[in-house]
């Protein structure tokens, strides 16, 4: 089972980059400022948002996600997937004055399962309560050093990184 989970994590990470481009990923560390915080990304409702726009008074929680990763959506009968916790996490963040955004940087499947139309359908089916934006060319993911989905980054009100990692310890 561990081998299957490791393989799935590797596949999800690889889907976040394109084979045509060789891009060195950054590595954000606690205290680092959020790169590209003012970069506009298209939400599933057509609106353009940046992290600055979506931040609450105490910061912003950025969750890299997609419609297809088994760690996000689960694997039938084997694992539950993290996306069923997204709304709970977003609700807790909102109570603390923190904005939340889901970022889809899966360029490899942009014309298929992770297209804007599929993102809209997936968000509706999952009942997302936060913006779900597309990271064209995986620019934000590369700037953050996001390697897998889900990958979580919590920034304070000054856009300094406080946490980077998984959603919880499950």
Question: Which role does the model predict for each range below?
Answer:
Residues 119-156, 162:
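Short, internal strand/loop/helix patches
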Residues 1-5:
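Positively charged n-region of N-terminal signal peptides that target proteins for export
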Residues 57-60, 95-100, 127-131, 149, ...:
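Loop/turn elements at helix/coil->beta-strand transitions in domains of secreted/extracellular proteins
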Residues 73-125, 139-140:
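Structural microenvironment flanking redox-active thiols in thiol-disulfide oxidoreductases
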Residues 50-79:
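Short active-site neighborhood of thiol/selenol oxidoreductases, capturing the structured segment around
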Residues 21-52, 81:
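N-terminal "domain-start" segment that seeds a small globular fold
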Residues 160-170:
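Non-catalytic, surface beta->alpha helical segment in thiol-disulfide oxidoreductase systems
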Residues 6-17:
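Bacterial N-terminal signal peptides
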């Amino acid at each position: 089972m561990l081998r299957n989970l490791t393989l799935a994590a590797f596949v999800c990470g690889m889907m976040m980059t394109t084979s045509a481009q060789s891009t060195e990923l950054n590595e954000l560390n606690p205290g680092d400022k959020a790169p590209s915080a003012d970069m506009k990304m298209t939400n599933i409702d057509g609106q353009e948002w940046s992290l600055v726009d979506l931040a609450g008074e105490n910061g912003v929680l950025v969750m890299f996600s997609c419609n297809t990763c088994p760690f996000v959506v689960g694997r039938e009968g084997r694992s539950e997937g993290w996306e069923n916790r997204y709304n709970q996490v977003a609700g807790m963040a909102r109570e603390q004055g923190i904005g939340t955004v889901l970022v889809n940087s899966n360029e490899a499947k942009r014309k298929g399962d992770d297209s804007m139309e599929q993102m809209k359908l997936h968000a509706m089916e999952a009942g997302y309560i936060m913006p779900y934006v597309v990271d064209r060319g995986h620019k934000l993911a590369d700037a953050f050093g996001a390697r897998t989905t889900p990958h979580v980054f919590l920034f304070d009100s000054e856009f300094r990184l406080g946490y980077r990692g998984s959603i919880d310890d499950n």
